[in-house]
Regions:
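HTH-adjacent hinge/linker in prokaryotic transcriptional regulators
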Residues: 1-67, 81-89, 102-105
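Conserved phosphate- and dinucleotide-binding cores of soluble alpha/beta proteins
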Residues: 1-10, 16, 99-269
Length: 269
């Protein structure tokens, strides 16, 4: 161990506060809520605990031939580390939004889709385009391109969607990659945006926020996302409070995995 050849990790059981989970489930009309106790003081460790719990349950939502849509981000990059054999085959995994504008920014898009595809003995499909382009006209043209159109169509056919909850912040991959420009951020902030799922922004009431960014975006829309039968949202950290609350009010989540502290804040919102 002292020479670095042995690494010891402690795998403790992840437990959920059932009473708090039940209260959240009833208040927001959710199918399931799993809240992970906060057993660490670091935000990364808490995020990993939540992702580990969600990844452990993923197989229970899948069957042979399932189509699952995913969106990239820091949470989903962490989620990919905990995927194991799903006990199903012929699973199709499709990205629900285009890629960031800078490939050097680690977002976990390919990591997650490939990990689920391998674990489900299936195939991964990506949207071969940036998440946002220079104009609405270019976005409209690209959405008609054969490969991009096919990926978006497959996304609309998903039985399951898996994603993290983004908050409107300059400390996000979307902003640091240049996909969300400063003028986009200012416009969204002025229009009351509080967060996003699959790079689709919404306000505190969960309503879609129309903006220059939304018109240049290449992804499913919030209305299309809502039609997916099983939407699994994964979130951790109190900074996600307002965004998660908006996502719940908007009906973008059916199954929620979060840390207990965040769950308490949402219940008392």
């Amino acid at each position: 161990e002292e020479m670095g050849y042995i690494k010891i990790t402690v795998e403790y059981p992840v437990l959920s506060n059932e009473e708090l989970s039940d209260s959240l489930q009833k208040r927001y009309g959710l199918k399931k809520v799993f809240l992970v106790p906060k057993l660490s003081s670091t935000s990364i460790a808490v995020q990993e605990d939540v992702c580990r719990a969600a990844a452990k349950d993923l197989s229970s939502y899948l069957k042979d031939g399932s189509i699952i849509g995913t969106a990239w981000g820091r949470t989903m990059k962490s989620f990919a580390n905990y995927i194991s054999d799903l006990g199903v085959k012929n699973v199709k995994v499709v990205q629900l939004n285009g890629k960031t504008n800078l490939t050097s920014v680690p977002v976990g898009a390919d990591d997650l889709s490939q990990a689920i595809a391998r674990a489900g003995c299936g195939e991964a499909y990506v949207i071969p385009a940036p998440v946002a382009v220079d104009s609405a006209e270019i976005a409209d043209m690209l959405k008609q391109e054969r490969n991009i159109s096919a990926a978006l169509t497959l996304g609309r056919d998903c039985q399951i969607a898996l994603f993290g909850i983004g908050n409107l912040s300059r400390n996000t991959i979307l902003y640091h990659s240049g996909s969300l420009k400063e003028e986009d951020f200012v416009e969204l902030e002025k229009k009351g945006a509080v967060g996003d799922v699959c790079t689709c922004f919404f306000n505190a009431s969960g309503e879609a926020v129309s903006s220059s960014f939304s018109r240049r975006r290449i992804s499913l829309t919030l209305e299309e996302l809502k039609k997916i039968p099983c939407k699994i949202g994964v979130a951790s950290g109190l900074e996600k409070k307002e965004a998660l609350h908006g996502a719940l009010l908007g009906g973008y989540i059916d199954i929620l995995y979060a840390d207990e502290e965040l769950g308490k804040e949402i219940l008392n919102y």
